[in-house]
A protein has these predicted regions:
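Structural motif
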Residues: 1, 26-28, 52-54, 74-78, ...
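Glycine-rich phosphate/diphosphate-binding loop of Rossmann-like nucleotide-binding domains
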Residues: 1-40
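Buried hydrophobic positions in well-ordered alpha/beta secondary-structure cores of metabolic enzymes
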Residues: 2, 20, 55-57, 68, ...
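Fold-independent oxyanion-binding glycine-rich loops
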Residues: 3-7, 32, 57-60, 79-82, ...
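C-terminal binding/interaction regions
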Residues: 4, 45-49, 53, 83, ...
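Short glycine/serine/threonine-rich phosphate/pyrophosphate-binding segments
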Residues: 9-14, 38, 58-68, 88, ...
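Alpha-helix C-terminal capping segments
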Residues: 22-23, 67-75, 123-127
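Glycine-rich phosphate-binding loop
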Residues: 43-81
């Protein structure tokens, strides 16, 4: 599954999806289920939980990867996205937040690295 916090994360989310599709992997995408409207995440949680691997694309403070990592047992690949304003620092806050997450087992890509996340997922899927 590919999960994105908001519509501003869509560019990176679609990069992940396109890269996986090129390699023959289809995946369900859940858009605009960020922590600012956590009720939207909860309404999709059962569907997200059906997947073996979850890629989370999130900007701002990047908390979505930690929240999903705390709720679900699957491997999580976090992709910080360079959206936000002020102290968000072009994705640095989202990156640092994901790296410092207290949810164990979250792997983190570099900022906006949707392709890298797709390739990491592909390695996991093919192993």
């Amino acid at each position: 599954a590919i999960v994105s916090g908001g519509s501003s994360d869509l560019k990176v989310t679609l990069e992940v999806k396109t890269a996986l599709e090129i390699y023959g992997i289809t995946c369900e995408t859940f858009i605009d289920v960020g922590v600012a409207g956590v009720h939207r995440l909860f309404s999709q949680l059962d569907k997200i939980n059906e997947h073996n691997l979850i890629i989370v694309c999130a900007g701002m403070e990047g908390a979505l990867a930690t929240v999903i990592g705390g709720l679900l047992p699957q491997p999580i690949i976090g992709v910080p996205v360079s959206v936000g304003y002020g102290v968000s620092k072009d994705g640095m806050v989202a990156l640092n937040s994901m790296l410092a997450s207290c949810s164990p087992g979250i792997m983190v890509m570099n900022i906006d690295n949707g392709y890298g996340a797709a390739m990491a997922a592909l390695r996991i899927i093919k192993s």
